[in-house]
Amino acid sequence: MDRTAKADLVSTLNGVFNANAVVVVAHYKGLTVADMQKLRSQMKQAGATVKVAKNRLASIALDGTDVASIKPLLKGPTLLAYSSDPVAAAKVAVDFAKTNDKLVILGGAMGTTALNPDGVKALASLPSLDELRAKLVGLIQAPATKVAQVVNAPAAKLARVFGAYAKKDEAA
């Protein structure tokens, strides 16, 4: 790779690090080509991307970015998974690592926050941005009658109790 290609790669990676919400770093030693293709396709389906780059070039590209805290993780055969959705890359990486022990999650970063492997796993357990939006829309679209029922339920129960006492007193 000549100097201009390296400079282009550093510039591209710098843009990637600045544009994405989360970056996950993992060791991939021992993964077969088929496994790597499977990981890439799963990432693509989730809206995330996997990139293998020279550690030295990735380290240079990290300078001046919010995710610069992952620099110490760039040792050995590392891959970078990133996505604009704060959960997508972490979720796919953790799920893939569960089924394939050759992918070892080293950590990552979400914005300026550095994540250890447990932090990446915790991030992966959160619902995605789309799932949260769907829940919010569902709550907003709940019919007003349900809200009225919830508000009126205590009064209705109280009225039934008073009615039962009244019938009991009449019978006595």
Curated annotation (Swiss-Prot):
Q: Which InterPro entries match?
A: Ribosomal_uL10 (IPR001790), Ribosomal_uL10-like_sf (IPR043141), Ribosomal_uL10_bac (IPR022973), Ribosomal_uL10_bac_type (IPR047865), Ribosomal_uL10_CS_bac (IPR002363)
| Molecular function terms from GO | large ribosomal subunit rRNA binding; structural constituent of ribosome
What are the UniProt keywords, alphabetically?
Answer: Ribonucleoprotein, Ribosomal protein, RNA-binding, rRNA-binding
On subunit structure and binding partners, the annotation says: Part of the ribosomal stalk of the 50S ribosomal subunit. The N-terminus interacts with L11 and the large rRNA to form the base of the stalk. The C-terminus forms an elongated spine to which L12 dimers bind in a sequential fashion forming a multimeric L10(L12)X complex.
Cross-referenced HAMAP family: Ribosomal_uL10
Give the protein's biological function. Answer: Forms part of the ribosomal stalk, playing a central role in the interaction of the ribosome with GTP-bound translation factors.
Name of protein: Large ribosomal subunit protein uL10
Q: Which organism is it from?
A: Methylorubrum extorquens (strain PA1)
